Amino acid sequence: MEIEFQSYLLYVVVDMELYNGSLDTKEIFGRWLDEYQNSNYGAYIPFVGIIRAEDGITALSFDIYKPILQSWFDKWVEKAKERGAIVKMAHSIGDVPIHTSSYVSAVFSPQRKVALSLINEFVEDFKANAPIWKYDVIDGKRIYAQDRSTPMSGAGLLG
């Protein structure tokens, strides 16, 4: 059975984008590069998260409460600024089929060491602390992925 998913931009604030469905990584990364190509940044480090086929899932599905995610992201924008860098991200809302992308991020920096360090820190913190709720899609049913989710400190979720 083949499921067709459509993707369209739902929400954008400076340097953070939310889309319905899987991400068009080539379009996003190309647009980001075009935006900053002439800004004298010596490093552009992208990261792509791809949905793996495991445990019988056909897709993952995501819920996001935008104000909480925006607050989390704004802290990273400030951390990046302090190091002379820019951090960007895009994430999916809703269903994202296996072998497609639900998350991309990138760092632009004058120095590669800063960019490499910052992208690693950002992606690791995203995985551990970004307020995004993940569900497995198995046989067309959405099942909360509690075993692969991280409790949010002070939120009373998953705790």
Where are these regions (language model features)?
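N-terminal, polar/charged subdomain of small-to-medium soluble alpha/beta proteins
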Residues: 10-101, 108-110, 114-120, 124-159
